[in-house]
């Protein structure tokens, strides 16, 4: 059966039995299959799981999460059944600082965060790559649905074959230096293939559901942020774009740009959240046309391939976005760029990522400022 699931060699100049691969194991089906597949192909696999949260027991029984409680047990059990070493590293304090606190502070700036990108950018890639080097391994392998293509010494990050599972949007902040050591063996497969492989390898987690939503949010977003930043639930005013007071809100944590439902105010036309003014603790609302825009300013740029001035690309403005045609332009501000969409787009949210593609290839991107 394994002949149906061929992958590119992890290293072109080393045979599998000479190649040591650290596999980041979350306890889910994808990373477990990646580890089992490589082990069966003869690679020297070392499984590593990061304990990111939940040592207080709060997240241990939560379904659809990862990297805590049951998931750690599942990763260890897979390693034992397949027959490769597995290590558990406690990264809870680092995760709290780099991801959870950033999540809360982003909301407090009136933005909508994507903690999964921050986690990949810091804990999972930056720190795990250092662990990989410390263990004397050749590569770091993850179960992400994304493809890494290498030609003439140049590495490209590309969309997964399975577009319904593609995770390239969440990996836009990966650097060229990191890509040299990273490998994504599942990018050429469909999720259904991975389920088949899990059963073929007799993995106990073959039917385990995929992780969903934000792993450390055990309640609602608002309750989680309220615990991290109590000031986010202070009452304030809801005003229109001209500053007229329309009502009162119960905390900015309950609102996000583009939101229509749950505003708690009556008006003669539908109103949407236009902006969250954290300085004045105000939620600014207006008609839908105010939310339609073509021009986007992005910051903290990461280009896997430096775009030329006016380069035509397709951009994704949220993970579920199918993509919009656009051009990329330089600005006078350091580490910022301007993206001009061909057509108006509704509800562009500061704090989200703007990721540029050229066909299947990830060019790079940045965080939306405005």
Curated annotation (Swiss-Prot):
<keyword id="KW-0963">Cytoplasm</keyword>
<comment type="similarity">
    <text>Belongs to the MnmA/TRMU family.</text>
</comment>
<feature type="region of interest" description="Interaction with tRNA">
    <location>
        <begin position="165"/>
        <end position="167"/>
    </location>
</feature>
<dbReference type="InterPro" id="IPR046885">
    <property type="entry name" value="MnmA-like_C"/>
</dbReference>
<feature type="disulfide bond" description="Alternate">
    <location>
        <begin position="119"/>
        <end position="215"/>
    </location>
</feature>
<dbReference type="GO" id="GO:0005737">
    <property type="term" value="C:cytoplasm"/>
</dbReference>
<keyword id="KW-1015">Disulfide bond</keyword>
<feature type="binding site">
    <location>
        <position position="143"/>
    </location>
    <ligand>
        <name>ATP</name>
    </ligand>
</feature>
<keyword id="KW-0820">tRNA-binding</keyword>
<feature type="active site" description="Cysteine persulfide intermediate">
    <location>
        <position position="215"/>
    </location>
</feature>
<dbReference type="GO" id="GO:0005524">
    <property type="term" value="F:ATP binding"/>
</dbReference>
<dbReference type="GO" id="GO:0103016">
    <property type="term" value="F:tRNA-uridine 2-sulfurtransferase activity"/>
</dbReference>
<keyword id="KW-0694">RNA-binding</keyword>
<keyword id="KW-0067">ATP-binding</keyword>
<feature type="binding site">
    <location>
        <position position="50"/>
    </location>
    <ligand>
        <name>ATP</name>
    </ligand>
</feature>
<feature type="binding site">
    <location>
        <begin position="24"/>
        <end position="31"/>
    </location>
    <ligand>
        <name>ATP</name>
    </ligand>
</feature>
<keyword id="KW-0819">tRNA processing</keyword>
<dbReference type="InterPro" id="IPR023382">
    <property type="entry name" value="MnmA-like_central_sf"/>
</dbReference>
<keyword id="KW-0808">Transferase</keyword>
<dbReference type="Pfam" id="PF20259">
    <property type="entry name" value="tRNA_Me_trans_M"/>
</dbReference>
<dbReference type="InterPro" id="IPR014729">
    <property type="entry name" value="Rossmann-like_a/b/a_fold"/>
</dbReference>
<keyword id="KW-0547">Nucleotide-binding</keyword>
<protein>
    <recommendedName>
        <fullName>tRNA-specific 2-thiouridylase MnmA</fullName>
        <ecNumber>2.8.1.13</ecNumber>
    </recommendedName>
</protein>
<dbReference type="InterPro" id="IPR046884">
    <property type="entry name" value="MnmA-like_central"/>
</dbReference>
<feature type="site" description="Interaction with tRNA">
    <location>
        <position position="352"/>
    </location>
</feature>
<dbReference type="Pfam" id="PF03054">
    <property type="entry name" value="tRNA_Me_trans"/>
</dbReference>
<feature type="active site" description="Nucleophile">
    <location>
        <position position="119"/>
    </location>
</feature>
<comment type="function">
    <text>Catalyzes the 2-thiolation of uridine at the wobble position (U34) of tRNA, leading to the formation of s(2)U34.</text>
</comment>
<dbReference type="GO" id="GO:0000049">
    <property type="term" value="F:tRNA binding"/>
</dbReference>
<dbReference type="Pfam" id="PF20258">
    <property type="entry name" value="tRNA_Me_trans_C"/>
</dbReference>
<feature type="site" description="Interaction with tRNA">
    <location>
        <position position="144"/>
    </location>
</feature>
<dbReference type="InterPro" id="IPR004506">
    <property type="entry name" value="MnmA-like"/>
</dbReference>
<dbReference type="GO" id="GO:0002143">
    <property type="term" value="P:tRNA wobble position uridine thiolation"/>
</dbReference>
């Amino acid at each position: 059966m394994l002949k149906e699931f061929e992958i590119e060699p992890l290293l072109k100049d080393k045979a599998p039995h000479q190649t040591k691969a650290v596999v980041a194991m979350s306890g889910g089906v994808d990373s477990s299959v990646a580890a089992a597949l490589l082990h069966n192909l003869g690679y020297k696999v070392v499984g590593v799981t990061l304990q990111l949260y939940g040592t207080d027991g709060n997240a241990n029984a939560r379904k659809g999460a990862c990297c805590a409680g049951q998931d750690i047990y599942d990763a260890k059990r897979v390693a034992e059944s397949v027959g490769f070493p597995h290590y558990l590293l406690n990264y809870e304090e680092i995760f709290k600082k780099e991801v959870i606190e950033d999540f809360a502070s982003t909301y407090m700036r009136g933005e909508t965060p994507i903690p999964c990108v921050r986690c990949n950018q810091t804990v999972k890639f930056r720190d795990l790559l250092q662990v990989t080097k410390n263990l004397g391994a050749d590569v770091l392998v993850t179960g992400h649905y994304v493809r890494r293509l290498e030609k003439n010494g140049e590495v490209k990050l590309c969309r997964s074959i399975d577009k319904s599972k593609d995770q390239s949007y969440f990996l836009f902040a990966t650097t060229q230096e990191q890509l040299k050591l990273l490998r994504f063996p599942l990018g050429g497969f469909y999720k259904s293939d991975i389920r088949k492989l899990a059963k073929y390898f007799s993995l106990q987690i073959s039917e385990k559901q995929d992780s969903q939503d934000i792993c450390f949010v055990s309640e609602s977003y608002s309750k989680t942020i309220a615990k991290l930043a109590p000031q986010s639930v202070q009452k304030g005013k809801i005003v229109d774009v001209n500053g007229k007071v329309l009502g009162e809100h119960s905390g900015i944590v309950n609102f996000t740009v583009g939101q229509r439902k749950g505003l708690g105010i009556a008006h003669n036309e539908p109103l949407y959240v236009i902006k969250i003014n954290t300085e004045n603790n105000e939620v600014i609302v207006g008609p839908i046309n105010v939310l339609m825009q073509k021009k986007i300013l992005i910051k903290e740029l990461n280009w896997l391939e430096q775009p030329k001035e006016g380069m035509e690309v397709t951009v994704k403005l949220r993970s579920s976005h199918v993509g919009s045609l656009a051009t990329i332009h330089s600005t006078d501000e350091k580490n910022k760029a301007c993206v001009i969409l061909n057509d108006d787009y509704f509800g562009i949210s500061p704090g989200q990522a703007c990721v540029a593609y050229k066909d299947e290839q990830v060019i790079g991107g940045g965080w939306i400022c405005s």
